[in-house]
């Protein structure tokens, strides 16, 4: 099992029960198509199981993490993250930060000037499977092995 997971909120706020929206707020997934990188701990995986009908997640690899940091990472004021910002945080490059996130050594919410989430666009060419069903039932929700390619289309 990987040390970190990439979680993407697929469904919006309409008809979302209070317990699910509260759980997703705790995971920093307040809006549709937001993505977060979380360490694969039992309590966080339990939260993902609880809201699996609203989010999709996949084990994170370093290349995807670096691509997200380079293209979609933002700091306060919604400004792009520069290499100087990464040096202030103690990382020489985005590859080093991506490796630390993938290994579960740090979280984006602990790196203060950075936003704890990535704002993604809807996927180019749409979803190939249903957004209303779990992955095992020909959908995309829950633990999804193909989510990495979908996220690359959303960047």
Curated annotation (Swiss-Prot):
Protein name per Swiss-Prot or TrEMBL: Large ribosomal subunit protein uL30
Q: Which UniProt keywords apply?
A: Ribonucleoprotein, Ribosomal protein
Question: Could you state one GO cellular component term attached to this entry?
Answer: cytosolic large ribosomal subunit
**Can you state the subunit structure given in the record?**
Part of the 50S ribosomal subunit.
* Single GO MF annotation: RNA binding
The entry assigns this protein to a family as follows: Belongs to the universal ribosomal protein uL30 family.
Q: Does the keyword Magnesium apply?
A: no
**Do you know which InterPro entries this protein is assigned to?**
Ribo_uL30_ferredoxin-like_sf, Ribosomal_uL30, Ribosomal_uL30_arc, Ribosomal_uL30_euk_arc, Ribosomal_uL30_ferredoxin-like
Gene assigned in the entry: rpl30
One Pfam family hit: Ribosomal_L30
Share an example GO biological-process annotation for this protein. Answer: translation
